[in-house]
Amino acid sequence: MSGGKSGSRLSAYSHLKEIGKGGFGVVYAAQRENGEKVAIKRIDKKVPKNRVWTEIQTMKELKKSKYVVEFYEDFVEDGYTYIVMELCEGGSLQAYVREHGALDDATAVHVLRQLISAVSFMHRVNVIHRDLSAGNVFIKDSKKKKMTVKLGDFGLATTLGRGETTCTIVGTPGFIAPQVYDQEYTQSADVYSLGAVLYTMLTARNPPPKGLPPTCGMSPNAARLVEQMMDTDAKKRIPLTQIVLSEFMYENTNENAVIFSREHSRDGRRQRSREPVRSSRDDRSRDGRALIRSSSQPAHSGRAPLSNRPIHDRMPSTSSRGFDSERGRERDRDSGRGTVPPSREDRNRSQLWPIRMDRLEGQRVCTAGGRYIVELDTRCRFEVAAQGNFVKRILIVEVDEMVQTVYVHRIPDRTVRGRNGEEELITLTNNPFVYTSYSQMPKEVQNDYMRLQKMVAVTISGRVAKVTFRRPSQFPDAQAQLMENGDLRIKLPRSVIVRKMDNGEIFNCIDGIATQKQAVSGITLTKVNEVYKYLIRFEQCLNGMDRGMVCFPIVFSAGTNMVGSSPSSLMPSGSSQTSRFPFSNLSNNQPSLVPHSAPFLTKPTSSQRASSANVQRRVSTDENSSPSVAPSKYKIKIDPTTQKVRSIQATDGRVLRCSTSKADQFIFTDPAIRPDDQRFMRTDRVPDRASEMLHTLCERMRKLHQ
């Protein structure tokens, strides 16, 4: 195909070569006048114009996602519609596995994580792909274990909510959810298709048109995830947001994981090798690098599968190992310390990627190596200091629906000095390096990331109380706190008893000074372990609540008959519930937050009882206060003349302004993501990270007009 007539839009492209052909048109590789390689899709004249328009609008809408084939431009010549887009020279994922064979588990997980990010972005803007298959996943970079892919071909995509959205049979056989054939489907159909793509990556074969595909030859966790994603019952199908929590994803994101090699016999059947192949990180670990031998990455863990954990509380339970195990009882007898929970290594391993920051917002720590700040429950930063207290780079870690992205902003040498905890944030650069997995990062960034992860998981989490038990019967003049990192603190009038989670060590800090430690023994040791066991079980009960209920942090007090009782026996039940387990009503204006769906809480039978069963969550108390926490997350500016709200600014530099030229238009600036302003109407899709600011701004405007 030639580049078109002189002077035409198509003539600006040369070296056109056909690289693909489908029912709706032909795709060419081409070259721009500046030498840039692109892909050009020529859509057949017979394709309905509304479908062409939908594909173009969808690509424009998804342009912000880095895992979607980027849209450049479109034009019409001689009745044909041309779409110019990013060229992925590696071809389709389907063609790649046919030529090179199945991917190993680690590479498949790396690709799946990118596709989850792309589909999550699509669903946030209410788009269903409807033809998500291995043939529509294109390879940008096929380097081993770092394969970069892009999702493309949105010719069948549609917006959720339109008349024909859930009642049209489209897609590629084998990748189509059963609900599509029934002409009743939602976004979960894309999850089924993602499962089919995962199956193709692991087997180099397309799944059968109907029924669950055979999973022989896969690792057990891989087979389990494929079955969960391709469950024929949409209601039982694993949600998109929980795929990253599966054991298969976890074990192949952690660099110490075993990767199963796959061999193909002459008849094409795949067999699992008897010898496990260690990831490249295991090979690197032999040279003695400190990063590889970090205590936060043990080779083995006794934790429960992530897929079995409640999603509503993303911080792992401090009680993921059973207390009645034989080995635990032996430790109890030998040490006299009582129950020994999972080690800090186990917890840090589960928090390596993504970093879990729930309920840690506002915490700051300054050290000689830099400043650590948890800006939001989904965003933290590390301002890395070099010699002379000059900042050399800033790591920003953001978690969106359990998909984590790391932005690295490099600061010119000796231009910015480190700041104290109370001082304002350092301005970020406009062109950060972006990483979506641990293995992508260079060694120096990996070291910085591990320092940040350890600071959040150990030090900062140890400052925030998750459960506060006021006046336990063992220590009537004290309060016991189970911290976010699993430590126990019992605050007495003149001292603080601490029980460390990682090694079970128990000591008493006189006057709260860590250097003045005293050993704890005898009856006091027994009482400490009783309180600890009780709080662990209490936390377990709360973790069993409905997924939509966020219960932590929680503050409560109990009666005097707690010793030897289980949490469930002490919770309200029957006519005596008021006197047996009264939750402290910390605020007279706080409505009852007792979740009626909790397995161990009973709905009060009268208003009198309800007043004694009030639970306050997310309270601002001394337990969770930090001297560095800002009094407010946002700063609102009001025009002194008109008394109208002009803008709202977040502590991390984001600014949302009201447009002065057009009513109901807003201007959003997010220097951490992009330097330019984003304008949008109130009825448009709100940019990422602006939703909460817009809600706060509108609420303030509404109150001013009352």
Curated annotation (Swiss-Prot):
Origin organism of this chain? Caenorhabditis elegans
- Basic and acidic residues bias spans: 261-290, 323-336
**Which residue ranges have biased composition labelled Low complexity?**
566-579
State the deletion phenotype: RNAi-mediated knockdown results in a normal first cell cycle division due to intact centrioles which are contributed by sperm. However, during the first cycle division, centrioles exhibit duplication defects resulting in delayed nuclear envelope breakdown, the accumulation of the spindle checkpoint proteins mdf-1 and mdf-2 at kinetochores, and the formation of a monopolar spindle in the subsequent mitotic division. At the two-cell stage, condensed chromosomes form an arc around the single microtubule aster that is nucleated from the centrosome.
Asked whether the keyword Transferase is assigned, the reply is: yes
State the post-translational modifications: Probably ubiquitinated by the SCF(sel-10) and SCF(lin-23) E3 ubiquitin ligase complexes, leading to its proteasomal degradation.
Q: Which reaction does it catalyse?
A: L-seryl-[protein] + ATP = O-phospho-L-seryl-[protein] + ADP + H(+); L-threonyl-[protein] + ATP = O-phospho-L-threonyl-[protein] + ADP + H(+)
Subcellular location, in the record's words?
Answer: Cytoplasm, Cytoskeleton, Microtubule organizing center, Centrosome; Cytoplasm, Cytoskeleton, Microtubule organizing center, Centrosome, Centriole
Report the residue ranges that make up the Protein kinase domain in this protein: 13-249
Q: What is this protein called?
A: Probable serine/threonine-protein kinase zyg-1
What does the annotation give as the result of altering residue 371 to Q? In it4; induces an arrest in cell division at all stages of development
Question: Which family is this protein grouped under?
Answer: Belongs to the protein kinase superfamily. Ser/Thr protein kinase family.
Enzyme Commission number(s) from the entry: 2.7.11.1
